[in-house]
């Protein structure tokens, strides 16, 4: 069973009012997107397609994929006007694959357990989503 992960990193992060897109901001010495890519790179996923903004394709190829030796990244493609278009472009870049996982590259805290459990669930149910419980720690 071949599984491909599509990592979306084409967002502008306009609500952050920053000149740097949030997936490329530094967190602990690395760009935010590094953490998601590293986790998927070390997972049972067979291939990764990185979808990024038009002006970031070459940057991602050289300063992310090559620099950090992400060997499972088989393609870096241009995103679209919105998330839907970016997902579509990622799907178009998929070669033969049985399952596709879609992850937001600006979310660095995906875990191996989430990925492995998702792959197992896909084998049984053909579709799934990952959610985390919200914990409210303050009193109103």
List the model feature ranges, each with a label.
Residues 1-2, 96:
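Short, Lys/Arg-enriched, disordered terminal segments
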Residues 17, 25-28, 71, 110-111, ...:
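Generic, ordered loop/turn and secondary-structure boundary motif
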Residues 34-97:
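Conserved N-terminal catalytic core of the sugar/cofactor nucleotidyltransferase
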Residues 11, 19-22, 47, 72, ...:
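Residue-level signal for pocket-adjacent positions within structured domains
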Residues 15, 23-24, 48-51, 74-81, ...:
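Short N-terminal micro-motifs specific to bacterial/archaeal maturation
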Residues 18-21, 61-64, 113-115:
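Short amphipathic alpha-helical segments
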């Amino acid at each position: 069973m071949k599984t491909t992960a599509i990592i979306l990193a084409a967002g502008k992060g306009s609500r952050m009012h920053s000149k740097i897109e949030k997936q490329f901001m530094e967190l602990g010495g690395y760009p935010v997107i590094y953490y998601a890519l590293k986790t998927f790179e070390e997972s049972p996923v067979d291939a990764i397609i990185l979808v990024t903004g038009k002006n970031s394709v070459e940057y991602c190829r050289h300063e992310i994929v090559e620099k950090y030796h992400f060997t499972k990244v088989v393609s870096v493609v241009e995103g679209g006007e919105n998330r839907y278009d970016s997902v579509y472009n990622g799907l178009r870049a998929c070669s033969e694959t049985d399952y596709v996982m879609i992850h937001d590259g600006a979310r660095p805290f995906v875990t191996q357990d989430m990925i492995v459990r998702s792959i197992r669930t896909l084998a049984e149910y053909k579709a799934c989503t990952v959610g985390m419980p919200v914990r409210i720690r303050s009193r109103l």
